Amino acid sequence: MTNPIIPRVGIATDAHQIEAGKPCWIACLLFEGVDGCEGHSDGDVIAHAIVDALLSASGLGDLGSFVGVGRPEYDGVSGTQLLKEVRELLESRGFVIGNVAAQLVGQTPKFGPRREEAQQVISDIIGAPCSLSATTTDHMGFTGRSEGRASVATAVVWKV
C-alpha cells in the first residue's frame, strides 16, 4: 500500500503602513497614482502574505526567517522575486504548490478591475492556481482609515 498524499495548509497575514510617494505594488502589479506601503521590501502585502502562507504550509518557517530585515540583499526586494524564491525553495525540498488564495484589506487601490490580471501574474510565478479578492473594513481600523493595507492568504502544498 502506498502512502496517501496529504495536503498541507498554511495561513498568513501581512500588513504595512501606507507611505506617501512610495510606488504601490499589490499582487506583483504597479498601481499608478496610489501611495504604496512602507517596508524593507516593495511593501506588496498580497505577495508577502502568500509567501508566508507557502512557508507555513511547508513547515519551512515564515517570511521573517526567509528574508529577514537584517539582510541587505533583500532591501527593496519585489514581491515577484520573493514568490520566485519561495517556489524554488519549496520545489528543492520536494513540495508542490496546489493553490493559493489571498484577500487584500484596504480602501485603496481599486483592485477589482485588475484582479484577473493579478491572479494570472501570481499563478505564472508560482506555477499553481491563484485566487484573489479584496475588501474594505467600512472605514474601521487602520486599513479603514487608509493608514495601511493588509492581506490574509492561504496556501495548499503537498510533499512528493
Curated annotation (Swiss-Prot):
Which GO-annotated molecular functions does the record name?
A: 2-C-methyl-D-erythritol 2,4-cyclodiphosphate synthase activity; metal ion binding
InterPro entries named in the record: MECDP_synthase, MECDP_synthase_CS, MECDP_synthase_sf
Classification via Pfam families: YgbB (PF02542)
Q: How is the cofactor bound?
A: Binds 1 divalent metal cation per subunit.
The record's EC number reads 4.6.1.12
List ligand-binding residues for a divalent metal cation: 14, 16, 48
- Catalytic reaction list: 4-CDP-2-C-methyl-D-erythritol 2-phosphate = 2-C-methyl-D-erythritol 2,4-cyclic diphosphate + CMP
Pathway membership: Isoprenoid biosynthesis; isopentenyl diphosphate biosynthesis via DXP pathway; isopentenyl diphosphate from 1-deoxy-D-xylulose 5-phosphate: step 4/6
Q: Which cofactor does it need?
A: a divalent metal cation
Q: Which UniProt keywords apply?
A: Isoprene biosynthesis, Lyase, Metal-binding
Q: Which GO terms describe its biological process?
A: isopentenyl diphosphate biosynthetic process, methylerythritol 4-phosphate pathway; terpenoid biosynthetic process
Residues involved in 4-CDP-2-C-methyl-D-erythritol 2-phosphate binding: 14-16, 40-41, 62-64, 135-138, 142, 145
Q: What class of enzyme is it?
A: lyase
Q: Which SUPFAM superfamilies match?
A: IpsF-like (SSF69765)
Q: Where is this site: Transition state stabilizer?
A: 40, 136
The UniProt function text for this chain reads: Involved in the biosynthesis of isopentenyl diphosphate (IPP) and dimethylallyl diphosphate (DMAPP), two major building blocks of isoprenoid compounds. Catalyzes the conversion of 4-diphosphocytidyl-2-C-methyl-D-erythritol 2-phosphate (CDP-ME2P) to 2-C-methyl-D-erythritol 2,4-cyclodiphosphate (ME-CPP) with a corresponding release of cytidine 5-monophosphate (CMP).
Tell me its family. Answer: Belongs to the IspF family.
Subunit comment for this entry? Homotrimer.
Q: What is this protein called?
A: 2-C-methyl-D-erythritol 2,4-cyclodiphosphate synthase
Q: Which organism is it from?
A: Corynebacterium glutamicum (strain R)
